[in-house]
């Protein structure tokens, strides 16, 4: 696994939500799970796809907040943009428990960014995660190997799953799947002003 230069621990602050934005499949969940495997905090990890969690947090009540936070030091919500009213739920958590730590990830920067912009003003730190950079690659791959693979990087990019493939056909398949999922998402949810 290629070590990312982003450091969760340096960006995590009490009384603020650390929001990790980034496109699908850039390694947000992997980054968070790697951090959690090393932390001494008592933590709770949740996924925005959990319908019960979405129902509970979208209520935005003190009771639902207290029940969710419990006696954990760190609360992590992966794919937070899938939870209705997540911005208000996060604000309520931070305001009610300023001594705790919070992390939320979102694969759709526009969705989560627009949802959290106003409610979390002054209550958030943001990390923008991108595909793996040449600098990050240079920590694990020799300079000669980077130069040898430059054409592949230029054609297929450096999404983690693309880098894990060994043949050009496999790389092409992965990048096409990523591209198609973005295009499908765009056409299903394109803005009303876009004809």
Identify the function of each model-found stretch.
Residues 87-110, 118-119:
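Conserved catalytic/switch belt of AAA+ P-loop NTPases
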Residues 28:
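Conserved lysine of the Walker
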Residues 20:
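Hydrophobic anchor at the beta1->P-loop junction of P-loop NTPases
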Residues 31, 35:
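Hydrophobic positions on the alpha1 helix immediately C-terminal to the Walker A/P-loop
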Residues 1-13:
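Pre-Walker A adenine-sensing motif
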Residues 128-195:
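Interdomain hinge/linker elements that couple catalytic modules in large macromolecular machines
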Residues 43-74:
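Short glycine-rich substrate-engagement loop in P-loop NTPases that contacts/grips substrate
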Residues 110-126, 141:
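Short regulatory helix/loop adjacent to the ATP-binding pocket of P-loop NTPases
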